[in-house]
Amino acid sequence: MVQDLEQKLWSIASGIPFSSDYFLQASPIRKLKKENLFSKVFETYFLELGSGWGEVAISMALQRPNTGFILMEKKFDRIRHTIREIEKHSLDNVKILCVNFNWFLEEVFEENLFSEILLNFPDPWPKKRHHKKRTVNSKFLESLKILLPEKGKFYFATDYGPYARKVIRLFRDSKAFSPEKVELKSERNEIPVSHFERKKREEGKRIYYIDRVLVQK
C-alpha cells in the first residue's frame, strides 16, 4: 500500500504538461548529483524550496555566477514565468524541479549537495488541526542534515509569529543547528526581498527571519 502510494506520488511529480531545457527530472531510483544538474560543475549549490515566481533565485543567480541554483516549485504558472525570466537573462546556472518538496526531498538529491537552502514563507497552517501539514518539523530538519554539509546554511522566513516560535523550538531541540549570531532576526541582507515579502511589509506585517548553520551531522 505504501509503495503503491509512493509510486503514484512519483507519477504525479513527473507529470509536467510542458517541456523546457531548464527542467530537471527527478527519479525514484537515481538521486540527482552535481554532475548531472548542469552542463558544468559549479563551486557551490543553492536550493530554494517553493521558489514562487523565481525572483529571489534569479536575482541571486545574476550576482553569483559560480553558484548553481535549483528551484523546487509545483505551480505551473509560476514555473512558466520563471522560465521566461531565466531566458530573458540568459542564465546558465538556474534549473527547476517541478516536485512537491513536502512529498520528496532527500529522496531526490545526493547527500551534502547544497551549501545553502532557502524556505521563504511556507504555508503556516494556523489552525491547530492543520499543524501536522507544516513543512518545518523534526523530519524536515533530518532532511536538511542530509542535504547540507557541516557549516551549510538554512534560511527561513515567515510572517506568522506562532510558526516562527515553533521553528525556533524545533531547532533548539535538534542540537544539530546553531544560529549564526541571534536566534531571530528582524532584517536579512543575504537574501533578496520577494514579491510576497514586500507585500507583507507594505501591509505592516512583522517578518521573522530564522537562519541556522548545520554544526553537527
From Swiss-Prot:
<keyword id="KW-0808">Transferase</keyword>
<feature type="binding site">
    <location>
        <position position="100"/>
    </location>
    <ligand>
        <name>S-adenosyl-L-methionine</name>
    </ligand>
</feature>
<comment type="similarity">
    <text>Belongs to the class I-like SAM-binding methyltransferase superfamily. TrmB family.</text>
</comment>
<dbReference type="Pfam" id="PF02390">
    <property type="entry name" value="Methyltransf_4"/>
</dbReference>
<comment type="pathway">
    <text>tRNA modification; N(7)-methylguanine-tRNA biosynthesis.</text>
</comment>
<dbReference type="InterPro" id="IPR029063">
    <property type="entry name" value="SAM-dependent_MTases_sf"/>
</dbReference>
<feature type="binding site">
    <location>
        <position position="123"/>
    </location>
    <ligand>
        <name>S-adenosyl-L-methionine</name>
    </ligand>
</feature>
<dbReference type="InterPro" id="IPR055361">
    <property type="entry name" value="tRNA_methyltr_TrmB_bact"/>
</dbReference>
<feature type="binding site">
    <location>
        <position position="48"/>
    </location>
    <ligand>
        <name>S-adenosyl-L-methionine</name>
    </ligand>
</feature>
<protein>
    <recommendedName>
        <fullName>tRNA (guanine-N(7)-)-methyltransferase</fullName>
        <ecNumber>2.1.1.33</ecNumber>
    </recommendedName>
</protein>
<feature type="binding site">
    <location>
        <position position="73"/>
    </location>
    <ligand>
        <name>S-adenosyl-L-methionine</name>
    </ligand>
</feature>
<feature type="active site">
    <location>
        <position position="123"/>
    </location>
</feature>
<keyword id="KW-0949">S-adenosyl-L-methionine</keyword>
<dbReference type="GO" id="GO:0043527">
    <property type="term" value="C:tRNA methyltransferase complex"/>
</dbReference>
<feature type="binding site">
    <location>
        <position position="159"/>
    </location>
    <ligand>
        <name>substrate</name>
    </ligand>
</feature>
<dbReference type="GO" id="GO:0008176">
    <property type="term" value="F:tRNA (guanine(46)-N7)-methyltransferase activity"/>
</dbReference>
<feature type="binding site">
    <location>
        <position position="127"/>
    </location>
    <ligand>
        <name>substrate</name>
    </ligand>
</feature>
<dbReference type="GO" id="GO:0036265">
    <property type="term" value="P:RNA (guanine-N7)-methylation"/>
</dbReference>
<dbReference type="InterPro" id="IPR003358">
    <property type="entry name" value="tRNA_(Gua-N-7)_MeTrfase_Trmb"/>
</dbReference>
<dbReference type="GO" id="GO:0030488">
    <property type="term" value="P:tRNA methylation"/>
</dbReference>
<keyword id="KW-0489">Methyltransferase</keyword>
<comment type="function">
    <text>Catalyzes the formation of N(7)-methylguanine at position 46 (m7G46) in tRNA.</text>
</comment>
<keyword id="KW-0819">tRNA processing</keyword>
